[in-house]
Amino acid sequence: MDFEFAYSGEQEAFRQEVRAFLDQRVPPERHAPVDPESLDDDTFAYFREVHKEMGARGWLYPTYPKQYGGGGLTADHEMVIDEEMARRDIPRHFSNGLVLPSILVWGTEEQKKQFLVPLLTGQQTCYQTFSESSAGSDLAAIKSTAVRDGDDWVINGHKLFITGIREPDLMYGPFVTVPDGARHHNLGYFLIPYPSPGVTLERMTLLNGPGQLFIYFDNLRVRGANLLGGHDEGWQVAATTLEQEHGGRGAAFSPDADLHQLLAYIRETKRRGVPVGADPTVRLTA
């Protein structure tokens, strides 16, 4: 039974356009290491510029509306882009983009222009700040607070196991805004510019590398305009964020490049003078 997916002529023409851009913009010597945490500063800066150029074409987040910096394209176009970037070991994103639909759904027009456009065009990157010491799988158990002070909110608390390769331009996440409120109706969801006075990032020392962080908030003051949704709708906004991941959208990728790299590795890499692929144990378990 044949399960091969066939692209249309229009989609293949788009593939040629993407290939031409990537081949011209990213020569083989610029292909990135497999582990994003291995990117040096120069390589990271290089690919940030590539992302900005892709964002200008609407290719960084191709299925989002053009009016906010997306491409207005289809999921098939996005898969073509993903495949071609994966074949060249080009990092797809440096942001946690799960917040993007939340801004589309819950954001005001001003918030979409201020926060969504720079993220979709690659001008800015962002961190998701959800987990706390008391709230991992139970997000509703968070303790960090946001207290209203005039038109602003003052945030205190901490987050941990926050994924990030470099410093972001924006953070997002829920905080307790109604201390005596009912569960799931006591949170507000904030978009926090970085750097800001009162925010400290600290790398965690873990066996799997430095890609996780502590984030501390000490009397951080944010504008009321940075509240996404109502002051007690943070749980609902967070659910919109996480729905993308629950549906698989947070892990969309093209497996072909990984498979090709694996096949090349077992064919070309030798152990005791014999290709890895010829090892009986490898052949038995493949």
Regions found by a protein language model. Name each.
Residues F3-Y7, V199-A286:
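Glycine-rich beta->alpha junctions and the first turn(s) of the following alpha-helix
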Residues R48-Q123, G164-L170:
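Internal helix-loop-helix
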Residues G58, I81-A86, F175, L191-P197, ...:
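Short Ser/Thr-interspersed hydrophobic loop/turn segments at strand-loop and sheet-helix junctions
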Residues G122-F130, G173-P174:
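A short, Trp-centered hydrophobic/proline-enriched beta-strand micro-motif
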Residues S144-V147:
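A structural signal for short hydrophobic beta-strand segments in well-ordered beta-sheet cores
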Residues D151, N156-T200:
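A short core secondary-structure module
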